[in-house]
Regions:
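Aromatic-lined carbohydrate-binding/catalytic grooves of carbohydrate-active enzymes
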Residues: 67-100, 128-137, 201, 268-278
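Glycine-rich, aromatic-flanked loop segments that form ligand/cofactor-binding clefts
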Residues: 42, 70-74, 102-148, 254
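N-terminal structural segment of carbohydrate-active enzymes
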Residues: 29-82, 113
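Aromatic- and glycine-enriched glycan-recognition loops and surfaces
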Residues: 49-67, 91-113, 237, 414, ...
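Carbohydrate-binding surfaces of carbohydrate-active enzymes
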Residues: 220, 224-730
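Active-site-adjacent "subsite" loops/lids of carbohydrate-active enzymes
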Residues: 123-180, 217-228
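N-terminal export signals
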Residues: 6-25
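Short, acidic/polar
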Residues: 51-64, 166-175, 264-269, 332-336
Length: 730
């Protein structure tokens, strides 16, 4: 039997291919009045109220110079004004008295170093005097009671959908940009504190829909669906109002929202990508059980709608969550790999320091090391496009209208993570694709799309996928993909049944997961060799926990995996099998014109994420390789786990290898860096280009290589944490 590594290393001879830039993405903007693409290394000082008197300004300005930071985000207003505000009810820091204008000192110091400067605001909380004067500004729970701040007595959570944001914070925003020559306002925690039932929210929602606010978040409730639409519209109304106020005063300045993410994000990422001139992924560190590639995943998700706009990756050197050790320092190994995985996936580093007073200076060195190295190699991080032929689709409408908050992880995030993990282990480059970017222009660069239980799809989206397959694209889909419309309403059959080669009959489950299920590999199937590669000696394979009963459109015997009915798991004496197999296929493999489609009517992706079964990884990768039907643009052979990516720049391309081979990879912190075994790399050179030079950026020095046709081959003796191989092209 093949080992897993041997299987992953197996690939056919590579054919030449053209590398396209991301669909819908505009070229990188030139440097000039629009500053958005200029900064490569960000700093943020998330100030404490007493910092205006106690913070060492000279230290920080010198630190920014040493690390080549070219942008700063500095706390300005909202909860606390760090400048001499004249606005009633904006709480001025009591440490301002008797000191020079803190903001003027910091702004002038940064401008002397040619730094971009954003002013940070935070509208999520206010004080007793405001609550007494404007009780309608305070967030209200479904019980009708005003919400006190959970962490700080004497403060209150604000309603961020009403006049507090629309009027008061608009006034704060305008005052800041009138007083200071900033490049924009960065608003933190501006999207609220949960559903608000204040008089403004109740009146405004009723005016829009003639309904009362829903009391629970139930995606099946049409009133709650209306609330989601109303909330989205109000958020974007606030966004555009603040942006308009800023640009009226300073035409080159913009509003930058601290928002965004993947399928579980609360704001429509398509709209976010259209509005934002730049954005920052705020996933600052790992917590509990989180994979080290989660930072890079955030970068892919943001890029799916922002295209080539600059995206920063916010990180923290401390152990922030869940117990909020805000001024702490974690292991340098953990910080390095977290930031490096972001760099490898197109994120520009942004460190966030809570308080300008350093209570533990150990974190400064790792920031300096990362930033100085990044500065020295900056031209190889000014990317024009990623190189990937596979895209994982993520769906916010599936999360909101089908899964809801209670089932969001099981039905949405976990299936996606299963495919993501399998591709990481196989070192296959891929991108994320937003559900509203399924038009031909955006999909033209992909050979294969993965649909991990993308249950809620409109008729138009399904037609876009159908057109994509007819033009030679391929799909891998799972479980209830296309069984619901975009509003989460169930369909009688899959909208993509014609592509799946199967129709929905019923659910095999009740309300609980199945146990002790199995699959039978059907060796007589003509597709057995393609789906069971690496599993030739398997008599049975574990099955799913959530399964659908479906009816095949094809003759019996074609498909290579059949269902074995669930078997009792207790008492042990009753665990005998009643059937060795059934005629029910558990995978459907179809050739449709030049395209191919694989459909699994069960939760293979979700189960892989939870259980990490070796067999399921092979099935997922066999499905991807069969539909993709072309070698991957990057092949990396060797032991270990890497996040491997490829990028194009103006006159070069780069291969990024982030070494995730570590016993703490699935825990909150890595304690040490562990060098990888040797890796052999093959990468395809763009058509019309010739290799001039190949060199390593981390270990520094020329890399011996060979070129055979369009294929560049080289050997990497070892990777400690991160290696970037730069390939200069002519």
């Amino acid at each position: 039997m093949m080992t897993r590594r041997e299987f992953l290393q197996t690939s056919a001879a590579m054919t030449a291919f053209a590398m396209a830039s991301p669909g819908g993405a505009s070229p990188l903007s030139p440097l000039g009045a629009e500053w958005f693409d200029r900064p490569m290394r960000w700093a943020q000082l998330n100030l404490s109220e007493d910092d205006v008197a106690k913070m060492d300004r000279a230290y920080w300005l010198d630190f920014f110079r040493r690390i080549h930071a070219d942008a700063l985000c500095l706390s300005a207003g909202g909860v606390v004004a760090f400048y001499p505000t004249k606005i009633k009810y904006q709480h001025r820091s009591k440490w301002l008295e008797g000191h020079e204008d803190f903001w003027t000192v910091m702004l002038e110091g940064c401008r002397k170093q040619d730094m971009v400067v954003l002013a940070r605001t935070d509208p999520h909380a206010t004080y007793d005097d405001v609550a007494e004067a404007h009780p309608d500004w305070i967030s209200v729970g479904p019980d009708g009671k005003k919400r006190p701040h959970p962490d700080y007595p004497g403060m209150w959570l604000t309603c961020t959908l009403g006049p507090y944001n629309l009027d008061f914070m608009t006034e704060v925003t305008q005052e800041i940009v009138e007083m200071y020559d900033v490049d924009g306002i960065f608003a933190n925690r501006w999207t609220g504190n949960g559903m608000c039932y204040c008089e403004h929210c109740r009146q405004d929602f009723r005016a829009a829909y003639s309904q009362d606010l829903p009391l629970e978040r139930n995606p099946r409730n049409p009133v709650y669906r209306n609330y989601l639409k109303w909330e989205q519209a109000r958020r974007f109304e606030i966004w555009e109002k603040w942006d308009g106020v800023i640009r009226k005063v300073r035409p080159n300045a913009r509003y930058i929202a601290n928002s965004g993410g993947g399928a579980t994000s609360g704001l429509n990422m398509k709209k976010v990508g259209e509005l934002a001139p730049t954005l920052f992924a705020d996933r600052q560190c790992r917590e509990r059980v989180m994979v080290p590639w989660a930072n890079g995943k955030n970068g892919k998700e943001y890029r799916s709608t922002l295209g080539n706009k600059a995206i920063g990756g916010i990180f923290n050197v401390g152990i922030v969550s869940p117990y909020r050790w805000l001024n702490s320092t974690k292991s340098p190994a953990e910080t390095r790999l977290w930031v490096q995985d972001g760099m490898a996936n197109g994120l520009r580093p942004w460190f966030n320091m809570v308080s300008g007073q350093l209570h533990d200076k150990r974190g400064q060195k790792v920031i300096e090391d990362l930033y100085v190295w990044h500065y020295k190699n900056e031209k190889y991080f000014r990317n024009t496009s990623p190189v990937a032929r596979i895209g994982i689709v993520y769906s916010q409408q599936t999360a909101e209208f089908y899964a809801g908050a209670a089932d969001m992880h099981r039905l949405v995030e976990d299936p996606q993570l299963g495919f993501y993990q399998a591709l990481i282990e196989a070192r296959i480059p891929f991108e994320m694709v937003h559900e509203l970017n399924l038009d031909a222009a955006n999909l033209s660069r992909f050979k294969t799309l993965i649909l991990p239980n993308i249950a809620a799809l409109s008729d138009q989206q399904c037609q876009q996928l159908r057109d994509y397959v007819q033009k030679g694209g391929s799909l891998v889909a799972t479980y209830e993909t296309s069984l619901y419309d975009e509003q989460g309403n169930p369909r009688k059959d899959f909208a993509l049944a014609d592509l799946f080669g199967a129709s929905f009959v019923s659910r095999a489950n009740g309300k609980t997961a199945l146990q002790n299920t199995y699959l039978y590999p059907e060796k007589s199937s003509p597709l057995y060799g393609s789906m069971l590669k690496g599993l030739e000696d398997a008599d049975t394979i574990i099955g799913g926990t959530w399964q659908l009963n479906v009816k095949s459109h094809d003759e019996a015997g074609k498909q290579p995996l059949l269902r074995i009915p669930a078997v009792a798991n207790l008492p042990m004496e009753k665990t005998f099998w009643t059937l060795d197999k059934t005629d029910a296929p558990e995978v459907f493999m179809n050739q449709i014109g030049a395209g191919r489609v694989v459909y699994f009517p069960w939760d293979i992706d979700r189960v892989y994420w939870e259980v990490m079964a070796y067999d399921h990884a092979l099935l997922l990768l066999n499905a991807i390789n069969w539909v993709n039907n072309e070698p991957h643009p990057l092949r990396v052979q060797g032991q270990g786990m890497f996040d491997a990516t490829v990028w194009l720049q103006k006159d070069s391309m780069t291969v990024h290898l982030v070494n995730l081979t570590n016993p703490m990879a699935m825990r909150p912190q890595m304690h040490e860096l562990i060098a990888s075994p040797p890796q052999d790399v093959e990468v395809e050179i763009p058509k019309g280009k010739r290799v001039e030079k190949v060199h390593a950026l981390m270990k520094t020095g020329a890399v011996q290589h060979t070129v055979n046709g369009s294929t560049l081959k080289f050997h990497v003796p070892s990777v400690l944490d991160y290696e970037v191989i730069a390939i200069d092209l002519v």
